Structure formats: C-alpha cells, structure tokens
Amino acid sequence: MQIVFMGTPDFAVGALEALIAQGHEITAVVTQPDKAKGRSGQLQFPPVKECAVKHGIPVFQPRRIKTPEAIEELKKYPADVYIVAAFGQILSQEILDLPKYGCLNIHASLLPKYRGASPIQRVIIDGETQTGVTIMQMNAGLDTGDMLYQKKISIASEDTFETLHDKLMVLGGEAITEALPLLEAGKLTPEKQDDAKTCYAALITKEMGRLDFTKTAAELDRLIRGLTPWPSAYTFYRGKQLKIWKAIPMATAHREAPGTILAVNKDSFEVAASEGALKVMELQLEGKKRMTAHDFLLGVKVQPGEILGE
C-alpha cells in the first residue's frame, strides 16, 4: 500500500520500521518541526525524521497541519491510508477524509480504556496487569474512533514506563502490519468504543512525582515505575530533593509514621508507608549522579528514625 506516515517520537519509529520492512511504499513522513536542544540551541531531528532520512523518505514538518498550505502539501503525496502514531497535532476532518482508507491511529492502550496522552504511564500507576495497542479509525474526537484491531501484552511487576514503552513500540509495529492486509481485504470489522468503559490518561506532570508516604508501599512502587525515567518520583531528605529510581514494596509490619526510615541495610534502606514499606534500591540526591543505595550509603550516614519528605 501507499502510505503517508505521521509520527514524531521513538514510539512511532517501531511502526515506521515495520511498515518499511513489510514492503509498503511510504510516500512521505510527516513529523513535528526540529527542536532546539541543550544550551547550544542546536536543532535536533525528531526520531521519526531520523528514520525517514535513513531510508530516503521525503519529510514534511508543518508547524500547523491544519492550514490550507499544509493540506495542499499533503495532497502531493499519494496514499491509500495515513498511519498516525504519536504525531502530536490534531488532524482536521478534511485531512481525515483525504486517503481511501482514511487515517489509522496506533494508540498505546486497549481502548476504550486510557484515551489521551499518557496511557503507558497510567496503566502502571493504576496497577493494571494487561495493556496493549489499538489500531483505530480516526475521527474528529480524541481517541474516540472505531476500533479495528488490538494486540495485548502482560505488564510485568518490574516494568517501568521505559521498559513497557519499548515493548509497546514493537507491539505497535506488529499490530499495524497485521492489520493492514486485513483492511485491504475488507476483513476488519469496526467496533464502536463503549464510552461507559473509558478512562482518560491525562498528561503527566513533574508535580505528580512527589511521593506521598501515606499511600501503600504497592502504590508508591507503581508510581516510581510509572514515572521512570521521566519525570521521576521524588521526595526530600535533609532538605534536598531525593529521586527514587528503584524500590521494592515490602510487607513489613510497623507502627511508625509514614515516611520514617525503618531500617538501614548494606545495600538499601526501608521507608514506612501507610501499609508496608519501600525498600529503596536506587536513588539520586539533588546535585549528584544516579547511584545504587549501596553506593549512596557509603557516603551518607542514613539513620533509622529520620523522616523522608522534609
């Protein structure tokens, strides 16, 4: 099939590479404009653009995809279907109607659950045991189109946003390459989403990362994993921000106030939660590098009874 591919971050690269490998003709890649990075302000290609350039595919980077000029540019690229994966701009109905098969979106959740911008983080934070990707026929709403195809995956107890993202990136490529032949053969049956079963995965913010030790150890562990590597979970220790990169929820019984350091071991320390405790394994004190708790404890004399969060 002739395809115009729309996407921007790493998540979309898996699908683009899979479509190229399957032999589809990618007539153009549409992605966000290059962004300045670091103190130098040097412009950096979006990951999808890097992939397109590597394969010699034309790249179109409109600041606003809805303008008449952008739409006229899109019309220059022949396409049976537009494939969209984390593009970052909302498409107008005029664009949705351009290709023969419309626009298909690769969404990183099992719709109708977790519509919105942050489904991967949210499924971990909420304690889901299963997620996946949905191939959806796009309409003018936000992730509200008819579902065409789904692939599921289990969420491991140690999965972080980073590891689950990478699994779903691969799964998205598998799903779209399995769905397209069925679409062309007329074997996909659109299924309307049940709005009663939906929930919205709102944008993740840095403020969400502050650990509230009045929650259970299991809840805190899920928050840490869901926000690793960005924006990261954190607390305060001796007046400085302390990022917690890895911890293990423990069923430790105690009577201490939430946030109290219960025990200090050679390679970890335990912090009281409302139920159970967090065994901190990897962390980063403000102004320092990320390190194991073992290395941290070699330089900092952490004492039982101290309180995190102050």
Give each language-model segment a name.
Residues 25, 58, 130, 241:
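Residue-level detector of anion-binding/catalytic polar loops
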Residues 2-4, 27-28, 58-77, 90-108:
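Internal alpha/beta domain cores that form substrate/cofactor-binding pockets in large enzymes
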